């Protein structure tokens, strides 16, 4: 079975591949957008993570005829009423500029005390099949915002986020966790694992 991940993000691709491997889904051939005939990527103008994930998954399966999985994710900061939210990747105005996004968020939270720095990573993953079926899973990873970046692993807001599991432990940011540790805890890992059973069913029937 071929499975398209509607992304060219190498780290997301590796993350999904690890989860498929852990589930023993050796029959699934994972593809990225660069592996299929190019198509115009849709405008992500949804109001929610689920909206945007559906937009991307539907575009992938429509243009390629291949079962497609897509995610939309970001960080929701309690003090900012859930923002950046769906705007996380372009919070500073430039899409995908992690450094600028992190710097802006830190500046906005500069005078906020520790007890009001609660945040959560949120991910919604959608699996869209050629027959029109869609399956949706959401993952949520609670924690707090740090006052400066820590760690070199991960991407996005990982260096600014201390997971709830680490607050009373070693105090590591999500950018200091190993890939395996992050897979086990993270919002995207939760959502992707929620789709594994359905992927296995589709693979067995193909």
UniProtKB/Swiss-Prot annotation:
Entry similarity comment: Belongs to the HAM1 NTPase family.
SUPFAM superfamilies recorded: ITPase-like (SSF52972)
Signal peptide: none
Organism: Corynebacterium glutamicum (strain ATCC 13032 / DSM 20300 / JCM 1318 / BCRC 11384 / CCUG 27702 / LMG 3730 / NBRC 12168 / NCIMB 10025 / NRRL B-2784 / 534)
Annotated Mg(2+) binding sites: 72
Gene3D superfamilies named among the record's database cross-references: 3.90.950.10
Binding note for cofactor: Binds 1 Mg(2+) ion per subunit.
TM regions (residue ranges): none
InterPro entries reported in the protein's UniProt record: dITP/XTP_pyrophosphatase, ITPase-like_fam, RdgB/HAM1
Co-factor requirement: Mg(2+)
Top-level division of the source organism's lineage: Bacteria
Cellular component terms per the entry's GO annotation: cytosol
Catalytic activity: XTP + H2O = XMP + diphosphate + H(+); dITP + H2O = dIMP + diphosphate + H(+); ITP + H2O = IMP + diphosphate + H(+)
Record-listed E.C. numbers: 3.6.1.66
MF GO annotations: dITP diphosphatase activity; ITP diphosphatase activity; metal ion binding; nucleotide binding; ribonucleoside triphosphate phosphatase activity; XTP diphosphatase activity
tRNA-binding keyword on record: no
Function: Pyrophosphatase that catalyzes the hydrolysis of nucleoside triphosphates to their monophosphate derivatives, with a high preference for the non-canonical purine nucleotides XTP (xanthosine triphosphate), dITP (deoxyinosine triphosphate) and ITP. Seems to function as a house-cleaning enzyme that removes non-canonical purine nucleotides from the nucleotide pool, thus preventing their incorporation into DNA/RNA and avoiding chromosomal lesions.
Protein name according to UniProt: dITP/XTP pyrophosphatase
Residues that coordinate or bind substrate: 7-12, 73, 155-158, 182, 187-188
CDD domains referenced in this protein's UniProt entry, alphabetically: HAM1
A biological process from GO: purine nucleoside triphosphate catabolic process
Active-site residues from the entry: 72 (proton acceptor)
């Amino acid at each position: 079975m071929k499975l398209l991940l509607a992304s060219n993000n190498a780290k997301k691709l590796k993350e999904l591949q690890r989860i498929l491997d852990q589930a023993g889904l050796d029959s699934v051939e994972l593809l990225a957008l660069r592996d299929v005939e190019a198509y115009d990527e849709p405008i992500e103008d949804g109001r929610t993570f689920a909206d945007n994930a559906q937009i991307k998954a539907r575009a992938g399966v429509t243009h390629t005829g291949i079962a497609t999985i897509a995610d939309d994710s970001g960080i929701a900061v309690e003090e900012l009423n859930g923002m950046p939210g769906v705007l996380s990747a372009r919070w500073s105005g430039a899409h995908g500029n992690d450094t600028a996004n992190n710097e802006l968020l830190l500046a906005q939270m500069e005078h906020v005390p520790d007890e009001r720095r609660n945040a959560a990573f949120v991910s919604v993953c959608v699996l869209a099949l050629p027959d029109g079926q869609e399956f949706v899973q959401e993952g949520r990873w609670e924690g707090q915002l740090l006052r400066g970046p820590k760690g070199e692993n991960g991407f996005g807001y990982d260096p600014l986020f201390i997971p709830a599991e680490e607050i009373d432990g070693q105090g590591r940011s999500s950018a200091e966790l190993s890939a395996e540790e992050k897979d086990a805890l993270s919002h995207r890992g939760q959502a992707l694992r929620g789709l594994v059973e359905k992927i296995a069913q589709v693979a067995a029937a193909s």
